[in-house]
């Protein structure tokens, strides 16, 4: 199985709105496996297709401690939201940067599973946060976009400094 390269901020592909997936294919099934492999290896709890340079509406998530509850969603959409939660988020495309983000705590999600079937389910707390974070990627939005201007600027400066330090070491 191939580990995919994770696209890093400020790559322009992270700002593109992704195209819907017309149907499930063998290629997409392989991509889903590779995305899970890449996400687990990173390690992370969610990964969106644009983070691996694929501009399609596809996300994978697994918030379980044992990494045995994988969820792959094609063309995911949030149907309903309720509540509010603040969670410290990070992103595999902006490594080392974490910030508290306010989001709905409960969501109703609809999408296509890897068998090509339409599914709908409720997600709460961390799973809801993770799915919303990944769907944001499909719409060209990053978690830092939810921050105030000052916090966003500080996060970006910190990230750029860390990347420069890594490049020089």
Swiss-Prot record:
The keyword Signal does not apply. Its EC number is 3.5.1.88. Its cofactor is Fe(2+). It catalyses: N-terminal N-formyl-L-methionyl-[peptide] + H2O = N-terminal L-methionyl-[peptide] + formate. GO terms for biological process: co-translational protein modification; translation. Transmembrane segments: none annotated. It comes from the Bacteria. Pfam families: Pep_deformylase (PF01327). Binds 1 Fe(2+) ion. The keyword Calcium does not apply. Fe cation binds at residues 91, 133, 137. Coiled coil: none annotated. Signal peptide: none annotated. One of its GO terms (molecular function) is metal ion binding. Keywords: Hydrolase, Iron, Metal-binding, Protein biosynthesis. Removes the formyl group from the N-terminal Met of newly synthesized proteins. Requires at least a dipeptide for an efficient rate of reaction. N-terminal L-methionine is a prerequisite for activity but the enzyme has broad specificity at other positions. PANTHER family: PEPTIDE DEFORMYLASE. This is Peptide deformylase. It comes from Hydrogenovibrio crunogenus (strain DSM 25203 / XCL-2) (Thiomicrospira crunogena). The lineage of its organism: Bacteria, Pseudomonadati, Pseudomonadota, Gammaproteobacteria, Thiotrichales.
